[in-house]
Amino acid sequence: MARCRRHIRSRSRSRNQCQRRRRRSHYNRRRTYRRSRRHSRRRRVRRRGCSCRRCSRRRRRRC
């Protein structure tokens, strides 16, 4: 039975490859969008805790 099940699984995979690819591409798009938001947040955090000459002179922690 295990062999038969494996064969069935492989068949279903080959059939649903295009559908899976579509789903993956859509998921990746959302993922990249999330990443970009995260990066922007990180940059803001860095700006808050800045330690450059300009910020130290003006007693600011932003660049």
Curated annotation (Swiss-Prot):
It is found in: Nucleus; Chromosome. Keywords: Chromosome, Developmental protein, Differentiation, DNA condensation, DNA-binding, Nucleosome core, Nucleus, Spermatogenesis. One of its GO terms (biological process) is chromosome condensation. The lineage of its organism: Eukaryota, Metazoa, Chordata, Craniata, Vertebrata. Testis. Protamines substitute for histones in the chromatin of sperm during the haploid phase of spermatogenesis. They compact sperm DNA into a highly condensed, stable and inactive complex. Belongs to the protamine P1 family. Residues 1-47 are annotated as: Disordered. The keyword DNA-binding applies. GO terms for cellular component: nucleosome; nucleus. Transmembrane segments: none annotated. One of its GO terms (molecular function) is DNA binding. The gene is PRM1. It comes from Planigale tenuirostris (Narrow-nosed planigale). It comes from the Eukaryota. This is Sperm protamine P1.
